[in-house]
Structures are given as structure tokens and as C-alpha cells.
């Protein structure tokens, strides 16, 4: 064997040694962490130890990503736990204890995949970071879930649609009041569900701007929890009933502070946009009152599904949206 071949063979052996040392070190560190021995007599423990470590790694990686990602928008989100039957051995990612049983051993978050005991789920903090692989669609998806999954301030549908409307539609007569073709609006919805932020809603595909406004309104209507949440609905209605304008404005501002951060940011962005719409009233014939009529029932829904309540509250819904538009620079 020539000297060059001997040198290459020696380097290969050295590389194998260097590779094995960190592996051995990792075994020792894991063993210390879990309180077991991995010497000559304890080597047989390495396989179950590795299995246990792997069962914990997804949780560790997820929490590390949350800690170190500076661009992450700090919106709190509760976990969406559902009873789950696990195949094979699983450990609780909260208490690190084994999940006993053959069926329904614990619960799994359907948004991020966190696995915990049912009793432990009551103590898990609101730190759900949804996994994009688990988000099947954009429409009908919880707003906070969507923005956390995509790590954005607002839902992509809102950003993309408003950007398109402001680029070519602010002077369109009856903007938001005139409806586009329903089947074309459904096409836009399917495009967002299928392609996400890559959805093409340009004038080349949808020349009628009313299709884009219709798709935006449909997104808000399809939210499982409205922009103005069920928890704050009655408080907004009560604020709208206050006769004194200054006191009413103050009351509305106080209730706004109760909205979840993602809802607040989306509502703020929408109101800034609608204010721009009213600034083109001479062309589009849409003032704050007209937009309030359109967006009141779209952004606000009573907690109880009552037609009578909805009809009774319509004027207050309109007034709330009108106030938000006219005073967006003060309220937000």
C-alpha cells in the first residue's frame, strides 16, 4: 500500500474515532440527565433511554424555537387538546411521566401535536405554536392559530386582499357594498386554501374588484371566532348604547383592549384600510355609515345564534364599526 493510501486510511480511522466520541458523550449526558448508567454493565439501557429521549425531543425543539425566534409575534394561543389513543410507548410532554393504558391514554393538541396527560392539559401554558402541516386550510381557521402558524401579524388573506383593493379599487363605486359573482369568490377562497400566500388574485385573473372584496368579507364571516370576539360582543353593544359621544368613545376603547392581540391587530389594520375607502367617498360613494352597515354583521356576531338578537343589535353593530372607522387614529 502506497504512502498516500496509508495516509487516507489513517484519516478515515481518525474520523471514525472523532465521530464515536461525541456519540458516546451524548449517551453519557443523557444517562446523567435521566439518572441511569450506561457503562459496560448498563449499556443495555441505551436503547430504551434513546426511545424516551426521542419521545421528548419534539417538545424540546418546539419550545426552543419559541424561545430563540426573535421574529416570532408573541400572540398567546391556547392548545386545542383532543382525547387521543397512542400507538407504542409515549411520555407526557408536560410532566415527563409514562402515559399508561391501551386506549385514550392522554390528549394531543390538534394544532401543534403536543402530547400530555388529560390532567396535565389543565396546567399547560398558552404557548401553542401551530404546525403548518396540521393547518389544512386558511378559511374557517381560527385567526390566532393561522397567524401563529405562519408567524405573521395578520392573516395573509387580509394583507393580500387589502393590498390588491388599495392598488386598483379604492375609487370603485359601491366598494364592499356591491357583490361579486359567488362562484368566483369561492374560487378565490379555494386558491387561498390551496396555495396560501402564493394565491394569484391579480387583475389578470379577477378583473372585477368586487370579487376580491367579497372574498375578504367571506373570510371574516367564516372565522369560527369573529374578529370582535364572542366574549367582547355584549360589551361593545353596551358601549354603543351610551348616549354621550365622549363617554361612548372611551367605553369602546376600553373594550378594544380586551380583544386577543391577533384580533386587535387585524381589526386595526382593517379600520385603517376602511378609513382610506371613506377618503375616496366622492368616487366610491361609501362613507363610514355605509361601511358600518356592510361590516357590522360581518365583524360581530352574538354568542347565541338568535335571529331576534341579531336583528335587534344590527343598528348597534353598524354604529360600532362606524365609530371604529371614524376614530381609528384615536382608538388604535
From Swiss-Prot:
GO molecular function, a single term: zinc ion binding
UniProt source species: Mus musculus
Superkingdom, natural source: Eukaryota
A Pfam family matched in the record: RhoGAP
ZnF start-end (Phorbol-ester/DAG-type): 78-128
Regulation: In the inactive state, the N terminus protrudes into the active site of the Rho-GAP domain, sterically blocking Rac binding. Phospholipid binding to the Phorbol-ester/DAG-type zinc-finger/C1 domain triggers the cooperative dissociation of these interactions, allowing the N-terminus to move out of the active site and thereby activating the enzyme.
SMART domains on file: C1 (SM00109), RhoGAP (SM00324)
Role: GTPase-activating protein for p21-rac.
Residues the record marks as site: Arginine finger: 177
Domain Rho-GAP per the UniProt entry, residue ranges: 141-332
Keywords: GTPase activation, Membrane, Metal-binding, Zinc, Zinc-finger
GO biological process: signal transduction
InterPro entries documented for this protein: C1-like_sf, DAG/PE-bd, PE/DAG-bd, Rho-type_GAP, Rho_GTPase_activation_prot, RhoGAP_chimaerin, RhoGAP_dom
Gene3D superfamilies from the UniProt entry: 3.30.60.20, Rho GTPase activation protein
Localization, UniProt: Membrane
Tagged with keyword Zinc: yes
One of the record's GO cellular component terms: membrane
This protein's encoding gene: Chn2
Name by which UniProt lists this protein: Beta-chimaerin
Membrane topology annotation: Peripheral membrane protein
Alphabetical list of CDD domains matching this protein: RhoGAP_chimaerin (cd04372)
